[in-house]
Amino acid sequence: CDGISIRTSKLSKEIIDSAKNLKVISRHGVGYDNIDLEATKQNNITLAITATANAQAVAEHVLFMLFSIAKRNNMYNETVKTGKFSDRTKLPKTIELWNKNILIAGFGRIGKCLLKKCKGLEMNIFVYDPFVSEEEIKKVGGTKINDLNESLNKMDAISIHMPLNENTKHLINYEMIKKMKKNCILINAARGGIINEEDLNKALNEDLIFGAGLDVFEKEPPSLDNPLLKNEKAFLSPHSAVFTEECLSRMGIETVQNIIDFFDNKLEKSKIVKIS
């Protein structure tokens, strides 16, 4: 074949090497840790992603998780449904997002989209991304953070939007979580391996942060004995941030269009993954 459209299946070196006519791989999504990049590079194959399709859906999902945790959605919902309405004054208090500090770690399309939505909530927005200039971040209403570790104790919410690679694997560990504010909400809708799940579970059990929202896991699906599945301070979803009707439609169209555009020499550079 000359082109492959792929979602979550593994595209190994063996498969890529055996596809002698393969010229382009179009990923149904923006992550590509399921594709052997070295083999892709060695075989001079172009890797494209649906760069413009999923930002709105993922940014909305991040806010959904942020609100759900801040407002203790699970607990308050269960209180009403189990006939304990009168216990409302005894429940742990919720928190507001207005005027709170949020750190967006990774400032690609999703991070930029999230910033716009957080501005509507009148949050104070900080951005960590070594590859984006202070001027560009300031232009859209954010404040650039140069040292991730030093900023953690000032943030009320942290949302991860980085790729998973050797530099970001287990970037968020126990020591880093210990530096966060006790009322901090940690959200990951990027890639599971960026957060050390064992460390996160320990930190949640020790009440080091307010709560965590995960749409992604180190192992998917997570095993049933993963303690985060039973942790009341963890708000979880099944890697479903993009599963809106609108987003899936956009992604499907863009995946195919990327292949067509490649062979028509019209594929946008912003949709091509630069493999170093």
Predicted regions and their residues:
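Glycine-rich Rossmann-fold phosphate-binding loop(s) that bind the pyrophosphate
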Residues: F107-G108
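Phosphate-binding beta-alpha-beta segment of Rossmann-like dinucleotide-binding domains, i.e.
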Residues: N43, A51-N101, C113-K116, G120
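A short helix->loop->beta-strand "cap" motif at the edges of active sites that frequently abuts
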Residues: A19-V24, N43-T46, E122-M123, K182-C184, ...
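Rossmann-like adenosine-cofactor binding region
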Residues: S12-I16, V132-P227
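Phosphate-coordination loops involved in phosphoryl transfer and adenosine-cofactor binding
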Residues: L22, W98-N101, Y174, N183
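Short, Asp-centered acidic motifs that coordinate Mg2+ and/or phosphate
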Residues: D2-G3, V24, A157, I185, ...
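An N-terminal-biased, well-structured beta-alpha scaffold segment characteristic
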Residues: C1-A48, N153, N173
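Rossmann-like dinucleotide-binding domain for NAD(H)/NADP(H)
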Residues: L47, N183-S276
